[in-house]
Curated annotation (Swiss-Prot):
UniProt cross-references to InterPro entries, sorted A to Z: MbnB/TglH/ChrH (IPR007801), Xyl_isomerase-like_sf (IPR036237)
Pfam families for this protein: MbnB_TglH_ChrH
Protein's recorded name: UPF0276 protein AM1_3026
Organism the protein comes from: Acaryochloris marina (strain MBIC 11017)
Disulfide bond sites: none
Upper taxonomic lineage: Bacteria, Bacillati, Cyanobacteriota, Cyanophyceae, Acaryochloridales
Family: Belongs to the UPF0276 family.
Annotated Gene3D superfamilies: Divalent-metal-dependent TIM barrel enzymes
Range of residues in the leader sequence: none
Lineage top rank: taxon: Bacteria
């Protein structure tokens, strides 16, 4: 089994359409991200993940922790996640700064939080509980919400920066989401990046968006757009060569297309790696 001490370079999101290609051809990709919720039930998906895990470093990324929900933490889900993490030994475990459940009922979306001091403390406590249960720090990912709460007392980046310190967790920085939010809500994305603590950024996501009537939607169904590539390069200038993932979740293309996107990201990463 490949040692799971760290990752570097540009990885690709693991999708079932590409299991056979990866296992047969063993492409030169430095690491892969698996959607943890897809493997909690065991069976054939977990079998494939274990086969791939034997060859590649893996990170686990989920959508169901519901860190911002008023519901109690779902201990059944956390137990399954811990069992998966203990079995796969991922480099990182991550989820979103969001809520996805009400009164025990889950819905198929990631809802944003009010950015207030009280919510900050509440979510920080829940993250701390999750980390204690899992026995590891987690990464939280920033969203691309299309609505904002009127009573926000903090900007998203102020909220995130404070949360990372209070919860003692790390950030999975989704550059596409920052770009989409900046365009839709009218802020300078560099203000966002400049507010984040450099030492807390452990992974970056890149994806494609869709534009409709001058509004951007984070669909993960297109190549990374030029403006996102530019913002990504600016992020690397601030944070250094942070391991980066190409996400593609709808209209999933051939593995070669994803490899080309990852190679483009790695070209930029190489420009910020220390020279021997």
């Amino acid at each position: 089994m490949v040692a799971m001490t760290a990752i570097q370079g540009a990885g690709i999101g693991l999708r079932s359409q590409h299991y056979a290609h990866i296992l047969t051809h063993q492409p030169a990709i430095p690491w892969l991200e698996a959607l943890s919720d897809n493997y909690l039930g065991g069976g054939l998906p977990l079998y494939h993940l274990e086969q791939i895990r034997a060859q590649y470093p893996i990170t686990l990324h989920g959508v169901s922790l519901s860190l911002g929900s008023a519901d109690p933490l779902n201990m059944d889900y956390l137990t399954q996640l811990k069992q998966l993490a203990d079995r796969i030994e991922p480099v990182h475990v991550s989820d979103h700064l969001a809520w996805v459940s009400v009164n025990g009922h889950y819905f198929n979306d990631l809802a944003p939080l009010p950015y207030t001091e009280s919510v900050l403390h509440y979510v920080a406590d829940r993250i701390s509980q999750v980390q204690e249960f899992l026995g590891r720090r987690i990464l939280i990912e920033n969203l691309s919400p299309y609505l904002q709460f009127r009573h926000n007392s903090l900007t998203e980046w102020q909220f995130l920066a404070a949360l990372l310190v209070e919860a003692d967790c790390h950030l999975l920085l989704d550059i596409n989401n920052v770009y989409v939010n900046a365009t839709n809500h009218g802020f300078d994305p560099l203000d966002y990046l400049d507010a984040l603590p450099v030492d807390r950024i452990k992974e970056i996501h890149l994806a494609g968006y869709e534009e409709q009537d001058h509004f951007l939607f984070d669909t993960h169904g297109y190549p990374v757009q030029p403006g996102v590539w530019t913002l990504y390069q600016q992020a690397l200038q601030r944070f250094g060569p942070v391991p980066t993932l190409i996400e593609w979740d709808t209209d999933i293309p051939s593995f070669d297309v994803l490899m080309a996107e990852a190679q483009q990201a790695d070209t930029y990463l190489c420009q910020h790696r220390p020279q021997n």
